[in-house]
């Protein structure tokens, strides 16, 4: 699930 991992990272980066 690389897509899910990337999505979580992107969501975290946007939250920061």
Curated annotation (Swiss-Prot):
GO cellular component terms, alphabetically, are: ribonucleoprotein complex; ribosome
Q: How does it assemble?
A: Part of the 50S ribosomal subunit.
Q: Which organism is it from?
A: Vibrio proteolyticus (Aeromonas proteolytica)
Name the job this protein performs.
This protein binds to the 23S rRNA, and is important in its secondary structure. It is located near the subunit interface in the base of the L7/L12 stalk, and near the tRNA binding site of the peptidyltransferase center.
> What family does the database annotate?
Belongs to the universal ribosomal protein uL6 family.
Alphabetized, the UniProt keywords read: Ribonucleoprotein, Ribosomal protein, RNA-binding, rRNA-binding
Q: What's the protein called, per UniProt?
A: Large ribosomal subunit protein uL6
User: Which GO-annotated molecular functions does the record name?
Assistant: rRNA binding
Question: Where on the tree of life does the source sit, at the highest rank?
Answer: Bacteria
């Amino acid at each position: 699930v690389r897509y899910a991992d990337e999505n979580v990272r992107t969501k975290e980066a946007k939250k920061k």
